[in-house]
């Protein structure tokens, strides 16, 4: 799509020049953006464009100029001598890179007809506006960051953001279109600040960590990492495991000590917590007493602190903590609230200004060092991803020889019957949602399978057994399983026994760390 927009000059030139990094100069030799001075690699916060300007080529003076000077007329493309170095623009580099990515090439990779790609590109660019929602599925593929980068580049070219009817990204119940507020905090002594992990858990499994004990909140061992067999080996080598969870999950089975936690509906106090979300301030009001031996997160935290002789620094009650984080907010609207005032509104108090829908980026100011929409990531130059460059998934692609042995891509998808692995054990839901793997009927026929058959799903990592179901909406070459399926509800084994745990090297440079590629997994299926 980007290639069509560039080739047919369908881009929004005003938006590109004035609100993106596409006219910024790049040193051809290093691939780095031209700045006023070298950045400090140890700086905790990147310098702003005001502190360390980016540069463009000013066509009026035929010289480099700071990007944010009002009188500058930046060149969109070209190659220039800048202080003895050959420099070009991000836009020029993008055009060069996109030459190989024709609609015909995209058809060969994706199966989407080239004519459809051209039509979609033209409709997206010519608008007048487009709201592009979704993107949630490919976050389980090894190359997911490239897809997100490419989407941002399309937006930068067309200006499909910051105007009525336009936007891009994952629509998650008000995260981006909702209003926000800021709670205060309970002050703690300096020696009670959070420590720093030696390394993330997915790296600790490789055997290089010093960690001997783990405290897990929720089903971290099964839900957060692929390849459960490797995770199990790591867990066996630990001296001590504690799991805090309302549910008896796969991770809980590995625990030496289980601290049963309450759900959001149970509390030993009238008010347990307070959150801001979905344009409202919401109290966690008590619905029922804690069941059985379950305890609240607040109680568990206090008891752990007591063992270290630090409980005196924590609030005496959860109501006291809630009152404090409200009153200490730097937002006057929030700090004026009390528990009684919020409960007078049935525990859900609207944030200020929610009568007007929140429209993001209407001022075309972005949360980047330059305050522009940044599509050139020079921190990823060494990985060849300063601009989005296609690379196949880690495992699930046609060019992988492994596909000759394991020809099906296993996709982990959401279901309306559960929230991840929560409610797995709800008996009345189980009658509608027996764990099954779904295949296209053509794949069923190849394997001599019928709906309801018990099958084994396997690869060189491991296997599990469940029942199979035909589904014409599943593409040939694919298999679908609702995520969060655990061993207690399968015939045998665990879905995570087969899932991919690899990740790309550049993952450490990404804002949220590497992608865990659960759906970037190849399997074969046979009758059990």
Predicted segments, located by residue:
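Acidic/polar loop patches that form or flank catalytic/metal-binding clefts of enzymes
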Residues: 10-15, 117, 131-132, 160-170, ...
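Phosphate/diphosphate-binding loops
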Residues: 230, 236-240, 245-249, 285-305, ...
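Extended redox/cofactor-interaction regions of prokaryotic respiratory oxidoreductases
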Residues: 70-81, 90-93, 108, 151-254, ...
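Glycine/threonine-rich phosphate-binding loop and adjacent beta-strand/alpha-helix elements that clamp
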Residues: 265-290, 299-300, 305-307
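A glycine-rich phosphate-binding loop feature that marks nucleotide/adenosyl-phosphate handling sites
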Residues: 18-23, 123-124, 167-178, 317-330, ...
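Long, well-ordered, tryptophan-enriched scaffold segments
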Residues: 2-127
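Long, contiguous, secondary-structure-rich segments that constitute the structural scaffold
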Residues: 141, 287, 297-342, 423, ...
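Conserved short loop/turn motifs at secondary-structure junctions
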Residues: 105-113, 135-142, 174-175, 219-222
